């Protein structure tokens, strides 16, 4: 099998720009995932985020997780469970309104650090969306405009730790799923593996590369590209050894009232395929309500369910201007 795509974004600024853009295009079309190096985010900042995130888990969350596992009987499993994940998490909201000042137990220095980190990830997310636009033949800013709706995109971070698990064959760190939203940027542990994606019917490891940012595409980009790019099923395996695995996933998603539909330009480019929309038109908030109930099920029935709701969305709605 071909190797997992690792993209050196620094090469976009030189003679290898065309080759690098082609690598991004291939990764989006054939993997739904790629890994970025030389992405412009300070390595010192990433080291500090990793250090303080692991310290926060040890200080504030480790004992709670152990108690929760014990209370649910997950420390003495005898058979496989498919309705729970072996992970400890908390969430930070950045857009349209930040909650980072309200999340309990965070040291002030950690709050400040994560605000800085979120700003850098937001900027990189928008830069990557424009690279996708370029490869798709869409005007610069098209995806960002679609994501804005009447307000701003929904942007937040899930901070996860996957502690050592005594029965990794019986419980996943995170069950297989596709991501509901737009573009997801992941800063993951470079010492402990575990993230896998499904490609051609086989589970493939996403290699932990120091200081890299893993990018994956969500369901909304599959719809907007009319299936040219696909969201891909992925999971996290539980581990028995070490200190556990850190994962910081930031989700740059459409605003709640954003109307999502295949880009007309991409339908036109599919002339040989009868110029038809293969995907529904819907309000992102409606999709999320459905997704929250069936996250760990196949995405195709979600798309079919949204098709049944299409009549509630005006047929002539286009991308709304940014604020």
From Swiss-Prot:
The modification N-acetylmethionine is found at residue 1. One of its GO terms (molecular function) is L-ascorbic acid binding. Induction: Strongly induced by wounding, ethrel, iron, ethylene and 1-amino-cyclopropane-carboxylic acid (ACC). Accumulates in response to very-long-chain fatty acids (VLCFAs C20:0 to C30:0). One of its GO terms (cellular component) is extracellular region. One of its GO terms (biological process) is fruit ripening. It comes from the Eukaryota. 2-oxoglutarate binds at residue 245. Pathway: Alkene biosynthesis; ethylene biosynthesis via S-adenosyl-L-methionine; ethylene from S-adenosyl-L-methionine: step 2/2. Belongs to the iron/ascorbate-dependent oxidoreductase family. It catalyses: 1-aminocyclopropane-1-carboxylate + L-ascorbate + O2 = ethene + L-dehydroascorbate + hydrogen cyanide + CO2 + 2 H2O. Fe cation binds at residues 177, 179, 234. Enzyme involved in the ethylene biosynthesis. May promote stem elongation by maximizing the extensibility cells, possibly by activating ethylene biosynthesis, in response to very-long-chain fatty acids (VLCFAs C20:0 to C30:0). This is 1-aminocyclopropane-1-carboxylate oxidase 4.
């Amino acid at each position: 099998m071909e190797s997992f795509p690792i993209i050196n974004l620094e090469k976009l600024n030189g003679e290898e720009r065309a080759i690098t853009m082609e690598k991004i295009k291939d990764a989006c079309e054939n993997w739904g995932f790629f890994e970025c190096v030389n992405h412009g985010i300070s390595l010192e900042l990433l080291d500090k985020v990793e250090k303080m995130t692991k310290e926060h888990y040890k200080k504030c969350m480790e004992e709670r997780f152990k108690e929760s596992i014990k209370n649910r009987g997950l420390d003495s499993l005898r058979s496989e469970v498919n309705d729970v994940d072996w992970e400890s998490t908390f969430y930070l909201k950045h857009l349209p309104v930040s909650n980072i000042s309200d999340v309990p137990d965070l040291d002030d220095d950690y709050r400040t650090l994560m605000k800085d980190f979120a700003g850098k990830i937001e900027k990189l997310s928008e830069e990557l969306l424009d690279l996708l636009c370029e490869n798709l033949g869409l005007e610069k800013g098209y995806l960002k405009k679609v994501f804005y709706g009447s307000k701003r995109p929904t942007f937040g971070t899930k901070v996860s730790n996957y502690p050592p698990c005594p029965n990794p064959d019986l419980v996943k760190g995170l069950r297989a799923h596709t991501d509901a939203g737009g573009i997801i940027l992941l800063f993951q542990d470079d010492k402990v593996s575990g993230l896998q994606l499904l490609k051609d019917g086989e589970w493939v490891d996403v290699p932990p590369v120091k200081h890299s940012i893993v990018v994956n595409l969500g369901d909304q980009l599959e719809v907007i590209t009319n299936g040219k790019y696909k969201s891909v099923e992925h999971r996290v395996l539980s581990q028995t050894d070490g200190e556990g695995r850190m994962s910081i996933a930031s989700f740059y998603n459409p605003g709640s009232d954003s109307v999502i539909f295949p880009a007309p330009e991409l339908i036109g480019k599919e002339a040989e395929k009868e110029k038809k929309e293969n995907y529904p038109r819907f309000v992102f908030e409606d999709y999320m309500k459905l997704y929250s109930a069936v996250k760990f099920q196949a995405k195709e029935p979600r798309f079919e369910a949204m098709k049944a709701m299409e009549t509630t969305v005006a047929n002539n709605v286009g991308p709304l201007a940014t604020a």
